[in-house]
Amino acid sequence: MTDRSTTLPTASAAALGVRQDALEAFVTALEQNGVELHGLAVVRRGHLVQLGAWTPWQQQRPTLAYSVSKTVTASCVGIAIGDGLLSLDDRVVEVLGPEVTGPVAPGVEQITVHQLLSMATGHTVDTLPAMLWKSDPIRAFCGQAPQAEPGSVFCYNNGATWLLGELVRRVTGERLVDFATRRFLAPLGITDLHWQESFGAEFGFSGCFLTVEQSAAIAELYRCDGVWQGERLLPEGWVERASREQISTAGEENAHSAMGYGYQLWWHPDGFRLDGAFAQYGIVLPEQEAVIAVTSGNFPSLGVMSAVLEHLQPGLAPLTDNPVQAGDPEQISGLEVPWPAGDGDPVGPVRTAGPVRNEQPAEALDQWWFPALADAAVGAQQGGWQLQLTLAGQPTAVDLGTSAWLTTELVAEQGHRVPVATRCRRDGATTTVSLAFIDTPHRLTLTLTEDGAVQRWNCPPLNGAPLAGLSVDYETVTPNRA
């Protein structure tokens, strides 16, 4: 098999007891519930047995993994602890020392490495919003007093993970991405990790771009207690501690997030998972010697996890003690993300004027920022079709696929060129345009009618990212808010 992105050996799905009917039931359940999957990798007993992508996403193109990045950061912390550079009981302000340049709010001086890892800093709101766009994020974190006793309460806290990355940078003298690659990613075959930065420092809490196979490999490393093909990469005992419940998350609204939290890992009765926004998962099932990794674009993301546990997990038959024979994995092909039916190509120009209305669930509009789009139009251009619109006050255009997805580029803010896959379809008087930002989970659908244009996202870009930020090549994400 070609186009691989890890050093995982391969075997046939049948040889390792992964039933084809389980995969078919999984895909059917997603389609029936309107769930958008982008990639799937299944690993059993250390062998890649299923791999594929849903067009226009590509199985060997890294995509933004969001909070799967947290597990990469935590792994670096575990290695630093194993090297004697940190300990779980270290107080963060003492490790940072002179890096703390401002006042330390009451309670912050008590916060330990363990509490950062388990998101139990005592804060009841995320500390990140006050940190992310500051030139001194450490000062911003230390200025936020915990609302409760450190160690007493769980709060999903991206700022805590950013600080873990800063601790690693400080005690190792290396960039986070370099330390991670040198110590544990390169043996997995991950040698060119891209990690988004702000003010010259990797996010830590997010920003890793990984293929679905690479997410599966990291999860498999954890399933194997930090040992990869006979070589110990993570310290002995680290995985056991990181993957068990460190603090209760019983108050979480999402049922799959209410079962407990470890060290930047979510716990559940059958195992644990690496978990990124909008269903980027590396699900570890220790008893079945299996890993199921998915990339996706869903808000909310509950449906993907439920389908994995309901359909894929039961399709893992008991293993025998027979040696595993090398073979080709089951290649998932011929699938594509949901696309509306229609009459065919546009038959003439369609123009709208004024702002593109935002049609999102109320909870999304309340929580997230969306790009300002206006004056959307679709017209003929050099034998094909083109979308024209105004983005953040500037005109831009992108060519459109019709009968199939077209991979091209959108010129976004500050002239940054963003990879997209596009498609356009007509249904009566309605023209639908889809822009898949294929370096990320995000897809924008524009609906144009005589009443104007409406935008809807499969899942909203996080952290105020401009459209220019939806690209692996965008080095420094900066806010783009009115």
Segments predicted by a language model, with ranges:
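Active-site SXXK
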Residues: 46, 63-89, 116, 164-168, ...
